[in-house]
Amino acid sequence: MISYQIVEHGKPLQRAVLETPKPEGTEVLMRITRAGVCHSDLHIWDGYFDLGGGRRFYVKERGCIPPFTLGHEPFGVVEALGKKAKGVKVGQKRLIFPWIGCGKCAVCKAGQDNYCVSGSRFLGVNRPGAYSTHVLVPDPKYLVDTTGIDDSFACTLACSAVTVYSAINKLPALGPKDEVAVLGCGGLGLVAISILRAKGMKNIVGCDIDDAKLTAALKQGAKRTVNTLAPDA
């Protein structure tokens, strides 16, 4: 298989020809057809997250040691199955949930693999990701049928969409007449507006410092917008 790897932080990704893994047990080999680029990928490529105030969080502390393959927004086609893999068939298209846990700790057993205390199996972070022709997935439970959604959009859902959906579900009970402010109208903010509308919210206020993004928020369904740099904001 072909992967594009970080060999040195801040330098162009390097093409690598690697052995295509063979799935065993419950494993599923996916042929990647779409891979989103998250802003976190850019931070990992840099080698650190800027925390502000001169502070940095270096990704090597999370096990991101070059060479490794980025990509935690994967979508692909089932290419091969281990003998114990059930529930999917070769040729089916699936979104791949990238936040893979150990499967043994309490949070994994509760179905919350993204909170896994091991933190060492996330695709594109500690495990080879989707900037590759193939990805090995440990279990079919991480594969999601997104029939009816464009593949190029579906690949982002297990990152940006679940982030926003989780935040919205933490809101207190709201009525249809209540206002909800969305702070920041970039990619996640626009997804937030879509989800809020789907949940019946009509009074959505988009807030940003970029007028172009505020225009996009109105097109997405915000009722009004606020430029937070404006004197009357």
Residue ranges and their predicted role:
Residues 1, 92, 177-178, 202:
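Nucleotide donor/acceptor-binding cores
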Residues 21-35, 50-106, 147-149:
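Glycine-rich beta-strand-centered segment in the early N-terminal region that forms part
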